[in-house]
Every structure is written in structure tokens, then in C-alpha cells.
A protein has these predicted regions:
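Extreme N-terminal starter segment of soluble prokaryotic enzymes
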Residues: 2-6
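Glycine-rich phosphate/diphosphate-binding loop of Rossmann-like nucleotide-binding domains
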Residues: 7-24, 29-30, 150-223, 235
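Buried hydrophobic packing segments
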Residues: 22, 26, 205, 299-307, ...
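N-terminal glycine-rich phosphate/adenylate-binding segment common to multiple enzyme folds
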Residues: 49-149, 153-156, 244
């Protein structure tokens, strides 16, 4: 029997509520598909930990986590207690960079039974993968401030794009498109306004696509691309984007399906030199934390992505199918999807449909 060692980190806010539901589904799936998952829970990467220790992570966090096959993460951030730039840069963004999780993969799919906010869209019309560069770009944190607290104050922050960094994420996107039925890849850019880094990104894309003649490609500037996500989401199959643009698109995409509460993501190191991390897109949602109404689907679907990454494809598919079946009934949906189910009832319905 195969065994996998997984680090689980609930984090903050609704992460503490939805992560246990994800674990419940993963454990049951493992039993049904005859493999074993050993979970080790960690209390760091949370604002509770920060308030006790004055930092988000222990000094030996890397040694603790790198022995695991993957990391299953809830959410981080309670801005009223710890500023976001401290909580995020001190935990999640540190994981991404030091474990070289240079791909952020976010599926976007409209499930049967869900009424999306977009008119006349049905299941099959919205089914795409967004590939976001995850370790450099606009979020490189290179820059500084001068003349603080004066009328001369200035702030400068640089975008860093390397040939190595751009090529590897674009290659991942092309390889992903190659496995998809439509074999189509869209490049997100803004080279008509950002005159140095985005033309460089586009040049690398043009060179990379020469290696993949079987892949159909197109390109949109980010301003019209967000409009097309709303007007014509069926146009898109795989979309590759820089760190900032990918961040925007991968929140907009799930919103077009009805809620970001169901959206999963993977922070992936494709070479498996380090563990990859899987988390829901929705964040810690302090406004609903503790109420028991958070949508658990994003966490559960992230678990399915983790199983797929580990090679348990059949088990992964069984979870996605159970989600589809569960969400087709209004009674199993949480409030953000127009239902009345609480977190536990929603996850139990998925469990019963496995």
C-alpha cells in the first residue's frame, strides 16, 4: 500500500474550519482507493503563532516541511491583528519562494446546477486552467521608499522577470495545454503600456510556442482579457500570466462561476525538489470566520488537486465527481451559492457522494 506524508496547516480564519473538512474527505478517499495518508498538523503560519512568538514561522520550518510529500494549507491572514504584509510575506510567500513553487495552478469550472452571474452560461462554457508565475514578476519586493512622512516621499517597486523564470512557467503552460482536449493557450500581457517587462514576456512566449506547433495560441492585453473573461469565458482553455495578472485572473475566473469559495489552487514545484502546497483561493475571510458557514469546496477540491499531483488520478477524479454531484442539489450548497447548508453539511454531502 502506498503511503504519503502530508503536512497540514490550518492557519487563520475559515482555514481552521474548512481544512478539517478537507482532511475528512481525503482520509475517506484514501481508504476507498487503497492508499494511506499520514497527516502531520502544524500550528505555525498563523496569526495565533505570531502573537505568541513574534514571527510567523519557527526557525526550523523548512526542515519540518521539506520531509513531506506535499503541504495541505487552509488560509493565512487576520489583518486586524497582524498586518497582511507581515503574515503573508512571513509564511505563504516564503513557502512559495524557498520551495521554488514557481507555478500557481488554478482551475476554473462551472459545475452543473450552479447559476452563474453571467447570463446564458452553462456547464462546459467555463472550464479553464490559469497558470500564474509564482516567484518573481510584480511581486518581487525589490525597491524602497525615500523621504518618508514628507511631501517629497516616493515609493519605488520593481518588476523582476528573468528568462529562466518566464521560460519555465510558460513551458509548464504549454505542456499542460498539450494534455487538454482543446490544446489552446492564451497569453496574458500588457505590452502596449508596460514597455519593458511585458514585451520581454511576449518575446519569450513567441519563442516558446515554436516548440509546440500543435498548440493553438492567442494573446490579449489584460484590460480586454478581463472583459473577455466576463463576456466570452468559453473562449479560454489554458491561460498563462505573470504573477500580478495571474492573481487577478484567477480570482475573476471563479467569480464568473458564482463564487471564489469553490476555487482551488496548487503552488507547484514541478521538478519535485520541494513539496508543493495546495490551498483554496478564498483566503481567511475574517468576516465569516467562526460562523460555520464557510464553503468547504475550495479546500476539498484543493485536496483533489493534491492527489492528482501525487499520482492518485482516479482518487482525485472521484472527489471532483462527488463535488459535482453534491453541488447539483441546492440543499448541499452554502450561502454563497444560494443554499442554506453550513460548512459541515456541505462537506458531508460530498463525502456521501464519493
Amino acid at each position: 500500500m502506498k503511503e504519503y506524508n502530508i503536512a497540514s496547516i490550518p492557519g487563520d480564519g475559515i482555514g481552521k474550519e474548512v481544512l478539517p473538512e478537507g482532511l475528512k474527505v481525503l482520509k475517506d478517499t484514501a481508504l476507498k482507493h487503497q492508499f494511506k495518508i499520514n497527516f502531520t498538523e502544524y500550528d505555525f503560519a498563523s496569526c495565533d503563532y505570531y502573537e505568541k512568538h513574534g514571527k510567523m514561522l519557527p526557525d526550523d520550518w523548512k526542515e519540518k516541511l521539506e520531509k513531506h510529500d506535499a503541504i495541505f494549507f487552509g488560509a493565512v491572514g487576520m489583518p486586524e491583528r497582524v498586518p497582511d504584509h507581515i503574515s503573508l510575506w512571513g509564511s505563504l510567500l516564503k513557502f512559495r519562494r524557498e520551495f521554488d513553487q514557481y507555478v500557481n495552478l488554478r482551475p476554473v469550472k462551472l459545475f452543473p446546477g450552479i447559476n452563474p452571474p453571467l447570463a446564458n452560461k452553462k456547464p462546459g462554457d467555463i472550464d479553464m486552467l490559469i497558470v500564474r508565475e509564482n516567484t518573481e514578476g510584480e511581486y518581487s519586493s525589490v525597491g524602497g521608499r525615500m523621504f518618508k512622512d514628507t511631501d517629497r516621499e516616493i515609493a519605488v517597486q520593481e518588476t523582476i522577470m528573468s528568462a529562466h523564470g518566464v521560460d519555465r512557467v510558460q513551458k509548464f503552460a504549454f505542456e499542460l495545454a498539450k494534455k487538454r482536449k482543446r490544446k489552446k493557450l492564451t497569453n496574458a500581457t500588457k505590452s502596449n503600456g508596460i514597455s519593458i517587462t511585458m514585451p520581454f514576456w511576449d518575446e519569450r512566449f513567441k519563442e516558446m510556442k515554436k516548440k509546440y506547433p500543435e498548440i493553438k495560441t492567442d494573446q490579449f492585453h489584460i484590460d480586454i482579457l478581463v472583459a473577455r473573461f466576463v463576456l466570452n469565458p468559453e473562449w479560454f482553455d489554458v491561460v498563462v500570466a505573470s504573477n500580478l495578472f495571474g492573481d487577478i485572473l484567477s480570482d475573476l475566473g471563479p467569480a464568473c462561476t458564482g463564487t471564489i469559495g469553490i476555487a482551488p489552487s496548487g503552488n507547484i514545484n514541478p521538478e519535485n525538489k520541494f513539496p508543493s502546497l495546495f490551498e483554496p483561493v478564498h483566503g481567511s475571510a475574517p468576516d465569516i470566520a467562526g460562523k460555520g458557514i464557510a464553503n468547504p469546496v475550495g479546500q476539498i477540491w484543493s485536496g483533489a488537486m493534491m492527489l492528482d499531483y501525487l499520482g492518485e488520478n482516479e482518487a482525485s477524479n472521484s472527489i471532483v465527481q462527488a463535488i459535482e454531484k453534491s453541488l447539483s442539489s441546492k440543499e448541499n450548497r452554502t450561502k454563497d451559492l444560494g443554499g442554506d447548508a453550513d460548512t459541515i453539511k456541505s462537506s458531508n454531502s460530498i463525502l456521501s457522494n464519493l
